[in-house]
């Protein structure tokens, strides 16, 4: 597997520091399961962070800090498998959300050749799996915020490039594109957005609003 497009360094560092949202952390962890280069970057960042913490002088805790810490430890949290490598069709970090078989997911059809499945992540950012048959494409759109797309099976292309398994495309509000699935097998992507997409055309706008895109 030759991965060409990687998450930005800022995203990797936020993940390493535990500062990324659940949806973004899931996308990065899934990419790491497929990419040894980025695993090394994150490992170095985590090691550097540990060294910095070891050099920090201790300070007195505020009143109630211990009780607050216990409350946070008791709070439920999603199990994102960090540092795991992919050993099957579904990368390890995704399995707690969808199981081990993409074919068993309860896909929802939104347009001819396109279906999606929403992942139950917390926070503002939303994570979805998008399944597109060869030749089909998501309607032309721009972005109110940022969108990150990780290819899990197949591939897709747009005016900005070609994306294969393991590749991550980062799209900002200035990016206008129409991703189209490549010939061959179905393209399944993990897409994370921190704001709604802006579709062109009346029908795509209506469909996007109905399905929460």
Give, region by region, the residue ranges found by the protein language model.
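Sequence/structural segment immediately N-terminal to covalent heme-attachment motifs in c-type
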Residues: 28-32
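Short acidic-glycine-tyrosine-enriched beta hairpin
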Residues: 158-178
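Positively biased amphipathic helices and basic secretion/translocation or surface-docking motifs
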Residues: 1-8, 22-23, 33-36, 40, ...
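Short Cys/His-rich Zn2+-coordinating modules
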Residues: 13-23
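Short beta-strand His + acidic residue motifs that chelate non-heme Fe in jelly-roll/DSBH
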Residues: 42, 138-140, 159, 177-183
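Glycine- and acidic-residue-biased ligand/ion/polar-headgroup-sensing regions
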Residues: 133-136, 142-158, 165
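A short glycine-rich, His/Asp/Glu-containing loop-to-beta-strand
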Residues: 104-140
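Ligand-binding loop in jelly-roll beta-barrel domains
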Residues: 175-199
